[in-house]
Amino acid sequence: EPSLASDVVTCVTGAMVPQLEAFRDMLLAEGVSHWRLFSIFPMGRAKHDPTLRITDEQFRTLMEFIRRTRREGRIDASYACEGFLGGYEAEVRDHFYECAAGVTVASIRVDGAISGCTSIRANFHQGNIYRDRFWEVWEHRFKPFRDREWMRTGACADCRMFRYCQGGGMHLRDDDGSLLYCHYKRL
């Protein structure tokens, strides 16, 4: 329907990388005009199943594929809203990277937990709508989301790109706040 905005989301696995062009062509044949591609981060099932994740080389291949597809202009393809991508930033998505979780976006889970994003671990929840007023939580909590200096540890401690990525996506932090992996360094 013309008035309904939609897109196709694809979680790219290692097995999917060699099939990207054929998959794109199938989407085009079906009339799809917007396509978002995600890489799978190592949590949940993907933590213990390497077939769900892509290697660094496959990640670069994915970025090159998206860049090439965008230049062709037949489908509006873009990379997910996660991870700073250095020189690929303006080439694989329409906006410069930012993790908007808890900054301009909040999520309420089925159990009432208030978080910046449903992809973020429970220990980053900031309240619960069944016991807290949402506006109070929004106005007075979310400090770990809005002040990212606590992320300047490990791989981020001396990184010259920190001012751009601010420590990456909150969903890429494990339970103790350590970075699971850095998109920029994968490239």
Model-derived regions: residue spans:
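Radical SAM enzyme [4Fe-4S]-AdoMet core and its adjacent flexible, acidic
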Residues: 1-115, 120-125
